[in-house]
């Protein structure tokens, strides 16, 4: 249930936030004169080089419009139609991409794995691979992990190492949906390479939209062989921007002075403040560990409905039926305090409808 309200900033999604100053300034600066189209411009080259510098490895970089395209096209490049993709049962590629991974891979089957708090248990990979090996069953080829997960948790470097080892054992490729990768890196306090290629990740979908950009994700192939003809996939699927500089230039602004990490750190800090405030309310139950920029809570139904009526927006269909409260790069302590004040007032009043 979503009701439009009067609050300037919301907790429904980091997609609600506007464009951060660094991305906006870089986009403005790129809007000078003419530049070659379809990615043959210096902005795209510079953004790609900055990503290579960030991960400290030569890699192939492609810019696409959104996360669904990034995930589905990169997964399609890792497998054939008779293969299967293994992911957590709550993964975005399973629950929120309208079958795009299957569509762009011409029918690759998605098989679901278990694991606590939205994270894949490496043993579940082993069980799924061993389950059937006959010609009548789609052959497992790719494992997809979400970092940070759909439940706001984060894989540690050690957990990713274990998954990477399991992938190597069974000759599986490893894909990372990193729509909130920046928040995961900020939470872990490690270098980006530690939770990507050093752990065995073949391709990362590096999110920009949820971290202060207007739109755009970067598909980063650490296994460069797998990027062969990926540019054709982008073109065929309508993801090759003719004026590519306007898709890639904001990445320059985000990466050149560390804004991508600062904004993620801020969003995480606001979520931590929100979590701490919620823990002081005995009527509120937190559902999952808060590790990145989201907090999942169980609100009494009358309170939830009255919060909607007061103009607060948040999702209540993600996870186990609880409410997801998401902080963004521009969330302030005042926003959190205002939300908590309304919540406290309704809890004291018993949330009786007016």
Locate each region found by the language model.
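Conserved PLP-enzyme active-site core in the AAT-like
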Residues: 2-310, 316-331, 339-354
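Ligand-binding grooves and catalytic loops that recognize ribose/phosphate and carbohydrate rings
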Residues: 335
């Amino acid at each position: 249930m979503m009701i439009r309200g009067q609050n300037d900033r919301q907790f429904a999604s980091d997609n609600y936030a506007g464009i951060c100053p660094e991305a906006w300034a870089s986009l403005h600066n790129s809007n000078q004169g003419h530049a070659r189209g379809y990615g043959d411009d210096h902005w795209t080259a510079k953004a790609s080089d900055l990503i290579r510098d960030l991960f400290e490895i030569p890699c192939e970089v492609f810019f696409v419009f959104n996360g669904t395209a990034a995930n589905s096209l990169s997964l399609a490049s890792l497998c054939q139609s008779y293969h299967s993709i293994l992911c957590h049962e709550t993964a975005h590629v399973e629950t929120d991409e309208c079958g795009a991974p299957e569509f762009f891979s011409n029918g690759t089957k998605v098989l679901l794995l278990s694991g606590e708090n939205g994270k894949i248990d490496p043993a579940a990979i082993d069980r799924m691979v061993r389950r059937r090996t006959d010609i009548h069953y789609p052959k497992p080829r790719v494992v997809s992990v979400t970092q940070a997960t759909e439940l706001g948790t984060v894989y540690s470097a050690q957990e990713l190492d274990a998954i990477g080892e399991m992938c190597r054992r069974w000759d599986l490729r490893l894909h990372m949906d990193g729509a909130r990768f920046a928040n995961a890196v900020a939470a872990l306090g490690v270098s980006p390479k530690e939770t990507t290629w050093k752990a065995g990740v073949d391709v990362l979908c590096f999110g920009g939209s949820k971290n202060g950009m207007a739109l755009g994700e970067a598909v980063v192939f650490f296994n460069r062989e797998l990027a062969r003809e990926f540019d054709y996939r982008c073109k065929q699927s309508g993801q090759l921007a003719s004026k590519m500089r306007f898709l890639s230039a904001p990445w320059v602004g985000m990466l050149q002075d560390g804004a991508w990490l600062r904004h993620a750190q801020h969003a995480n800090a606001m979520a931590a403040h929100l979590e701490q405030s919620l823990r002081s309310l005995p009527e509120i139950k937190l559902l999952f560990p808060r590790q990145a920029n989201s907090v999942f809570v169980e609100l009494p139904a009358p309170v939830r409905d009255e919060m909607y009526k007061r103009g607060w927006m948040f999702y209540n269909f993600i996870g186990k039926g609880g409410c997801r409260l998401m902080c963004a790069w521009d969330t302030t302590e005042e926003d959190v305090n205002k939300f908590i004040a309304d919540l406290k007032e309704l809890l004291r009043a018993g949330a009786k409808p007016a």
